[in-house]
């Protein structure tokens, strides 16, 4: 399902993260909002950088099980949980105001969401939902240094300038989150497991749809003109193709093999 959190009375921000985050993102959208509806494809080919990092033996991380030949190849390859990893952003032609504070849950070895796109100046509140402490920090971010965060505790941080910021956890090395501070983002949403999405639009105008994964743009930018009525995109937005995915997988495997060889030589 799709969720909205309000920017004052405007209700411009949409997040489709499902029932598990109803308490996180708050109020319903304005009844006057139009919606841009569409579908993503190729998302099962996306590869979270955490997986590639885990293959490096020098990190002493977890390892993947041997492939089972009786299982179909497309199920033997990891694929992302796009309802919180793949963010669909609606970009306006002018800078947007920051919305009210956004709650990010930290639990189960991950954050919810994993990638988020917000205007600079948006206050993010990180809440620990695990029964043990976390030590979040921002990579190369002097204003977000490691600090203990116990069960239920909250911690706030605001991206002041445009850019991409990575959040990690000293207590859980596989936890990685990406915050994209984009001045023109007017609304965001997260797709269903089938890739379907609906993003709300409060003001008519010219917009651009752009998907983000692991802090980076994926797929082509799609121009959209919104009037009073909903817009249904006929063509699916491809966020990854097989050729590129295979090339990235090959490069990852070669890097892991090289690291393993160097490790054995020590």
What are these regions (language model features)?
Residues 14-26:
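Bacterial N-terminal signal peptides
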Residues 31-266:
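Extracytoplasmic copper-binding redox domains, predominantly the cupredoxin/blue-copper superfamily
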Residues 3-5, 17, 35:
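N-terminal leader/targeting segments
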Residues 1-11:
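N-terminal secretory signal peptides that target proteins for export/translocation
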């Amino acid at each position: 399902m799709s969720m909205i959190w309000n920017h004052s009375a405007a209700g411009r921000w949409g997040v489709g993260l499902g029932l598990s985050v109803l308490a996180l993102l708050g109020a319903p959208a304005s009844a006057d909002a139009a919606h841009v509806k569409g579908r993503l494809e190729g998302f099962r080919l996306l590869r979270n950088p955490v997986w590639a990092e885990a293959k490096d033996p020098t990190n002493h991380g977890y390892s993947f099980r041997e492939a089972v030949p009786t299982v179909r190849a497309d199920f033997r390859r990891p694929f992302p949980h796009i309802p919180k990893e793949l963010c669909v952003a609606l970009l306006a032609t002018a800078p947007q105001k920051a919305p009210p504070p956004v709650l990010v849950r930290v639990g189960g070895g991950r954050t919810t969401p994993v990638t988020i796109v917000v205007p600079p100046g948006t206050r993010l509140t990180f809440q620990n939902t695990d029964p043990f402490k976390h030590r979040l920090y921002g990579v190369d971010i002097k204003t977000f240094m490691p600090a203990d965060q116990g069960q239920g505790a909250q911690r706030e941080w605001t991206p002041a300038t445009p850019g991409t910021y990575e959040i990690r956890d000293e207590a859980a090395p596989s936890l990685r989150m990406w915050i994209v501070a984009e001045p023109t983002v007017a609304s965001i949403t997260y797709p269903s497991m089938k890739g379907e999405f609906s993003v709300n639009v409060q003001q008519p105008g010219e917009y651009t749809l752009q998907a983000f994964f692991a802090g980076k743009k994926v797929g082509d930018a799609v121009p959209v003109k919104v009037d009073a009525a909903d817009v249904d995109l006929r063509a699916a937005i491809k966020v990854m193709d097989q050729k590129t995915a295979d090339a990235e997988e090959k490069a990852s495997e070669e890097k892991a093999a090289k690291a393993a060889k160097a490790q054995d030589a020590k």
